[in-house]
Curated annotation (Swiss-Prot):
This is Reverse gyrase 1. A zinc finger (RG C-terminal-type) spans 703-731. A motif (DEAD box) lies at residues 214-217. The lineage of its organism: Archaea, Thermoproteota, Thermoprotei, Sulfolobales, Sulfolobaceae. The active site is at Y965. It comes from Saccharolobus solfataricus (strain ATCC 35092 / DSM 1617 / JCM 11322 / P2). Its main location: cytoplasm. Induction: Protein levels increase during a shift from 88 to 80 degrees Celsius and decrease upon a shift from 80 to 88 degrees Celsius during exponential growth (at protein level). Constitutively transcribed during cell growth; no change is seen in the presence of methyl methanesulfonate (MMS). 0.7 mM MMS reduces the amount of enzyme at a post-translational level via a metalloprotease (at protein level). At 72 degrees Celsius this gene is transcribed at low levels during early and late exponential growth (until about 50 hours), declines as stationary phase starts, disappears by late stationary phase. The keyword Ribonucleoprotein does not apply. Its EC number is 5.6.2.-. Keywords: ATP-binding, Cytoplasm, DNA-binding, Isomerase, Magnesium, Metal-binding, Nucleotide-binding, Topoisomerase, Zinc, Zinc-finger. Mg(2+) binds at E625, D754. Residues 801-1242 form the Topo IA-type catalytic domain. Pfam families: DEAD (PF00270), Topoisom_bac (PF01131), Toprim (PF01751), zf_Rg (PF17915). The gene is rgy1. It is found in: Cytoplasm.
Amino acid sequence: MTSINKVPPSIYTRSCPNCGGNISSQRLFNGSVCESCLKDDREFSNLSDLINILSENSNLKNLTQIRDVLEEYKKVEEIFGKLLNNSKPIGPQRSWTIRFLRGESFAIIAPPGLGKTTFGLIMSLYNATRNRKSIIIFPTRTLISQTVDKLAKFSELYSYSPRILYNKQSPTQTENILDQLKSGNFDIFISTNRFVIQNLSELSNIKFDFIFVDDVDAALKSGKSAKAILRLVGFTDEDIQTTMKLLRENIGEEEKFGKIQEIRESRLKDKIVIFSSATISRGNPILSSLMGFRPGSSVIYLRNIYDSYIDLTQTCKGQDFEECTLGTVIKLLKRLNDGTLIFVPIDKGAQYADYLASNLRDHGINVESVASSSISKLEKFERGEVSSLVGVATHYGVLVRGIDLPWRVKYSIFVGIPKFKFKIGEYMHPLALTRLLSLVYLVKNDDKVRGLLSYIRKRLRKISPAALAMLAKDIREGKIDDERLKEAYNLVNEYLKDNEFLKKVSDVGDLVIEGDYILMPDYLTYIQASGRTSRLYGANLTTGLSVLLIDNSRLFELLNKKLNLILDEVKWYSLDIDADKLGQVSLSDISAKITEERESLSKIKKEGNVESSSLSVKTTLFIVESPNKAKTISNFFSRPSTRSYGKLRVYETVLGDRVLIVAASGGHIYDLITEDESEKQDDNYVYGVLVKDSKFIPIYSTIKKCEKGHQIVKDLSQNKCPICGSRIVTDKTEVVDILRKLALEVDEVLIGTDPDTEGEKIAWDIYLAIRPFNGNIKRAEFHEVTRRAILNAIKNPREFNDNLVKSQIVRRIEDRWIGFKLSRKLQTEFWEQHCTSISKKNSKDEECKENRNLSAGRVQTPVLDWVVNRYQKYNENKKKYLIIESQDKSIFPFSVLALKKNGLSKNTQIIIHLEDINIKEEEFGPLPPYTTDTLLSDAANLLRIPASDTMRVAQDLFELGLITYHRTDSTRVSNVGISVAETYLKSKQVDISKIFRPRSWGEGGAHEAIRPTKPLDETMLKASIEQGDLELSKQLTFNHFRVYNLIFRRFITSQLPPLVVTKQIVRIRAYTKDNIELELDENKKEFVIGYKLKEGDEFRQTLQDAIYTLFRLYQPLDEKMKGKELSATITGTLNKSDVQLYTEGELISEMKSKQIGRPSTYAVIISTLKKRRYIIESKNLKKIIPTKLGMAVKEYLMENYKQIVSEKRTVKLLEKMNEVEEGKVDYLVLLKELYNEIQTIS
């Protein structure tokens, strides 16, 4: 349980877990129920104790079903104890069991050693004791034989003998088995996939209550076998066709999946279906849609590997390269000895693998080369009869994907960098084709190319690794039946003939051009192949050693760049065999550690006690706000399995010592209730807050939304919107129910909402809502959505910060009280006066009823005051100017403003005299990285993106893991951030010593400036997305890239030397042809004609995509123009003032400097003023102008309530709120002050 000094009192309506009534925060914090359900106010450490007390008091209501599940769980736990030497289910098994007992179907994707098959067998045994029938499906008869033996042993230990049937080979036995199945004379039927497909018509008519598919990857290897599984579950051919049609239809997601859900619920009914696998290479969308869950994929990014290298380009200098390479491999194998996988480049192929293996055997090394058909050699390696294997480094190769032996594989050796290599003009590998097509699209921006790319990607995603290998072979041999594929090859090869295009592609796309050949690092193959040395086995992630023999230095740089992008950071160790050194570490020590681990695993495997290694594995529910963030996080560790609960999608993945279940709350779940004054229960109720005995108790209800988009925060008696009468489509009560369900099945809950007061309050509300269902709940804090940051947050959870919670409570109540009180005044009293006045002026007789679109707020009112005052001063100082433009804009591109004179009008000829031309240099920057206010200001001023849009874009970029948290007033850069800049600069091949100036820009602390999380400029980001290196859960728009580019440039420039800006200053006069002197707005023009880096300027061109500049570059005027006259013309007039109107950016800067608002509210304040039509933005110059309504509102509020909404009072109050956040001020004292203040509003 979390430690909070004193729980802030509040009431949550309809949130009692037992009766659905109102309940206090203290009771939820205690893991209890409401007073109506239990008079005693006591604390419960677990749900079982609470249920027992309620049962004793005969007051068990909504928790009855959970009581039944927990009682059955105890029985299953007893079975586990009897069968597994008094062992209880480990974390994942407990989660699976609870889901099973709730009647859920789901997928288990977990590594060997977590007891998946054992779980399936025990649940089928449990089912048998309840007269329910089970079918367990395996890929091979060998596994069936082992399972029958295991079940026999289980039956003996449990003293219960279920009727077990299993399929045999002969037709007679098959017929006999089918007869027994039809008669129902069985409890457990054990079958192969093949038997199910061959006898589907008979088996689909037999009612199985529990279907357990032990190797779903094998079961889904073809559409036919996937269809067989669906038919066995009970789905008809018509169901499958309907689902296929619905998935293709262009209708809303809710309608589409609602119809599929109806099919699912009608067929599954009382059936439970569980898919189990250690890995899965592909999915089936129809099966996933109908089952309501999707199996995940193999865990390829979880690794504990020493990545080492030997640079053959240096060590083999002056020697025969092939002989030197062979000698290095021999020396390595004699040093490492046993358990090694050796990978040769795909361009050298299987022939070279055979050649290498033969040479190694000649040197006394026990090695075999393997291909896809070498099953016997793999088995020999597994038994230890062969010490090492040689195969081709290709992503579908048998050694890359087809071997999973954690107790056997120790080392990997790459004889050259894994790569795609092809001659320009030939048919390359289809995966290389997709990468090149994406680069063609980036450089040429050709929609036809984009269409081909999309088509080929979809095709490749649908086929199995074996089918991909066959396709690659056919293409290599010139057999291409697919016309669109052929068109893509022809198009790419045509482009590759253009040398200029090749240069552009190599700059953008991480490839090496060697003569007529193109080389691209195959980083996925390196990750997967080296990953064979570091596998999950139970709770253990084995240690591995990978040795990469570098045969191309540039390709190694590109490989490293890709690996850092995918894995966050890869540390490389230089390997010196003779010195026995791995970097500064002893090679012998690492080797001994690896060998000891493998011996331990071999012993566990031999003794058949796999589960004993998994006792520390636990299940963790990780809750975030947004679905995008949930998807991004779950994809860090694998392609997760998913399950759907209504509209909420839940992701499941594996992290070594835990199974991680990721879900999203969708932002705030609760908010202050919004009953009208007429609905008040008593006078102590003040706008959603109960005021009693000097206590302030906020009342919260779940947030609801209707079809028309209205948000409602009140308890409804009907499923109807009280505003418009439309149907309620979203009620966060559903989210609470789902999170409670998930919390019950896990060992711990971590709440990873945003790291600010709003995020803390969301987390606190979730904590209270689920506390009765799980007592082990903590806060996970992270400031960037990266693998490194998420792992750190999971490993280092913290307690809840009650000061942040109290601060948000104060802010929300203050916003509500002031907002509602003053808003009512505006909507009624003010509007009646204002509307009547307008009607009289317009000679109209209008009925001036209340105007509910009007609102006032503590912060928005001073900001409106600034806008109105600035506008008034602007008008007071406004003058009319003539616009004068040179007739030759190529010489002088600037407009000149002159005070209007009588007799001068449009098209009048004017002379501009260039009196003097000078040059000066100034240092510019570096500026610190962005904070929220500076980002919003720059985005508004430079990109003309409104603040509200910039915040939405930044929120997306944060959730997609591309930038750090965007609501911040810190300029600090962490060491991780500095390393991002360093990595980027190295990737641009600049001299770090000349140009890199690492700066932290602030003191230590949790918060950081807004910066990129990856060393990718805008062009590189686009390339990474197009090539599939980055798979984002949301498509980026034009504005996403523009804002990202701004953030990236500002950050990188903050780590560079200052810029030296060259300016030209031109002093001018203007007069008519009659020598009448004109009074100019300014008699000089100052503009930037160039810039350079103060140090390391030779790299400026290389870094042009990364340098932040606020200025536009102009062509310099020739100094010979000094004293010359230019012909010009008056082109128009404009009004100009000495006082400038605000832009959005300037208004935000003003809020920051005057300490009005916070990073999270700057955009909201401006957006609200626009929404209420108090201000508008001019079309061209984007200046903020108050409307007549805005000016009237400001005048009314300042005349009547200045003491409440003045800038001075607002700043003072915001300071006190910050002090609540820091624990310096009691939040109840501040609420009392606010309460007294609103009483003055009569």
